[in-house]
């Protein structure tokens, strides 16, 4: 049997390896560590090369960059790339998110204040309301918006011309975008999980910016437990630094990193409390699956959205979990991770 006391004792909101942003303070720290230019950006080779070419071409023609859609799991650098696009183009960036744009007027106010070639970044673009999305279509295609002035019989439509601009949309759920919206993006890039070597470079770079003394094997130890996600790698680095300063001589070696991450309940495979909790529920409560998502959510006390967007992608990518037409199933690798005999097919 798997020990469950520790697994079920940690609250999801305290999860250190979540790729979601935890606080305004952490977001400020992330901004300080972000690369500013494409040359500084590590990983995502395909997306980076595409953007390099399209940005250079747009600059040579003196045009706004075509609209860009960035999608993939959270924490992989979509916001960072949006800022880099604006900086490489030499223009301003205006940032908002889908849930914030509740009314058509909210979007119209942003669009009418853009300067030529500016970048408008909409995070969680899949959460735009249909009313706001309708306003966005002509803005993206013709650089125009139609807004209603007045109410009732006296209401009239006014067409407003916009300067050429670039929309950068980011989403963790590309499948939830409507076809008309998706089709208006000329550049579409999927961001993938990072490998350990790429994350080691990111951890080493961040350590330099934070003045952390870090050995090469210490950097790799942090990187390989970071779930393929730079945001998590930087968060773990800060916690390992704290541990090194209090429990050691301030130098993050492999041994120090291992001890610090063990204290944080991040195991050698990079799985944390919630990962193990989800896998344990499927293995023990549902005999390894298949089991429906709603049942898994009820068993571990998490929302289905959090499971699908935050917990599952890494487990699937690493081969611990399968999504099948009949439901979620633990793989042989999951059984072996917990020292359990593999279930016969």
From Swiss-Prot:
Where does the chain bind ATP? 33-34, 75, 78-80, 141-143, 184, 194, 231
Head domain (RuvB-H): annotated segments: 268-345
InterPro entries xref list = AAA+_ATPase, AAA_lid_4, DNA_helicase_Holl-junc_RuvB, P-loop_NTPase, RuvB-like_N, RuvB_C, WH-like_DNA-bd_sf, WH_DNA-bd_sf
A Gene Ontology BP annotation from the UniProt entry? DNA recombination
**Statement: the UniProt record of this protein carries the keyword Kinase:** no
The alphabetized UniProt keywords are: ATP-binding, Cytoplasm, DNA damage, DNA recombination, DNA repair, DNA-binding, Hydrolase, Nucleotide-binding
The record's top EC class is: hydrolase
Renumbered to this chain, the signal peptide range is none
Q: Which reaction does it catalyse?
A: ATP + H2O = ADP + phosphate + H(+)
- Region (Large ATPase domain (RuvB-L)) residue ranges read 4-194
Q: Which GO terms describe its molecular function?
A: ATP binding; ATP hydrolysis activity; four-way junction DNA binding; four-way junction helicase activity
Q: Which family does it belong to?
A: Belongs to the RuvB family.
Q: Which NCBIfam families match?
A: PRK00080.1, ruvB
Domain comment from the record reads as follows:
Has 3 domains, the large (RuvB-L) and small ATPase (RuvB-S) domains and the C-terminal head (RuvB-H) domain. The head domain binds DNA, while the ATPase domains jointly bind ATP, ADP or are empty depending on the state of the subunit in the translocation cycle. During a single DNA translocation step the structure of each domain remains the same, but their relative positions change.
Under HAMAP family, the record lists:
DNA_HJ_migration_RuvB
> Its biological function?
The RuvA-RuvB-RuvC complex processes Holliday junction (HJ) DNA during genetic recombination and DNA repair, while the RuvA-RuvB complex plays an important role in the rescue of blocked DNA replication forks via replication fork reversal (RFR). RuvA specifically binds to HJ cruciform DNA, conferring on it an open structure. The RuvB hexamer acts as an ATP-dependent pump, pulling dsDNA into and through the RuvAB complex. RuvB forms 2 homohexamers on either side of HJ DNA bound by 1 or 2 RuvA tetramers; 4 subunits per hexamer contact DNA at a time.
Instruction: Name the chain's protein.
Output: Holliday junction branch migration complex subunit RuvB
Protein species of origin: Chromobacterium violaceum (strain ATCC 12472 / DSM 30191 / JCM 1249 / CCUG 213 / NBRC 12614 / NCIMB 9131 / NCTC 9757 / MK)
């Amino acid at each position: 049997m798997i020990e469950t006391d520790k697994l079920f004792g940690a609250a999801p909101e305290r999860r250190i390896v979540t790729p979601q942003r935890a606080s305004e303070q952490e977001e400020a720290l992330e901004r300080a560590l972000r690369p500013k230019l494409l040359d500084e950006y590590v990983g995502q080779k395909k997306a980076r090369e595409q953007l390099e070419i399209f940005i250079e071409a747009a600059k040579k023609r003196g045009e706004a960059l075509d609209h860009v859609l960035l999608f993939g799991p959270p924490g992989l650098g979509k916001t960072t790339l949006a800022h880099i696009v604006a900086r490489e183009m030499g223009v301003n960036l205006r940032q908002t998110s889908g849930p914030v744009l509740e009314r058509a007027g909210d979007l119209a106010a942003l669009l009418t204040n853009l300067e030529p070639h500016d970048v408008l970044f909409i995070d969680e673009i899949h959460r735009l309301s249909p009313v706001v999305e309708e306003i966005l279509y002509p803005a993206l295609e013709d650089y125009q918006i139609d807004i209603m002035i007045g109410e009732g019989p006296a209401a009239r439509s006014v067409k407003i011309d916009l300067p050429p601009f670039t929309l950068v949309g980011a989403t963790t759920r590309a499948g939830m975008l409507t076809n008309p919206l998706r089709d208006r993006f000329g550049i579409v890039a999927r961001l993938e999980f990072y490998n350990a070597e790429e994350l080691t470079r990111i951890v080493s770079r961040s350590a330099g910016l934070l003045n952390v003394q870090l050995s090469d094997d210490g950097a790799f130890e942090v990187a390989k437990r970071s779930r393929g996600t730079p945001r998590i790698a930087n968060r773990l680095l800060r916690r390992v630094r704290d541990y090194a300063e209090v429990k050691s001589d301030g130098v993050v070696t492999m041994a120090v990193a291992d001890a610090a991450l063990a204290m944080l309940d991040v195991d050698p495979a990079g799985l944390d409390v919630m990962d193990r909790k989800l896998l344990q529920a499927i293995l023990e409560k549902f005999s390894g699956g298949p089991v429906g998502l709603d049942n898994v959510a009820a068993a571990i006390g998490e929302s289905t959205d959090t499971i699908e967007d935050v917990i599952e992608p890494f487990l699937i990518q690493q081969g611990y979990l399968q999504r099948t037409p009949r439901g979620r199933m633990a793989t042989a690798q999951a059984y072996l991770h917990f020292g359990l005999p593999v279930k016969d097919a």
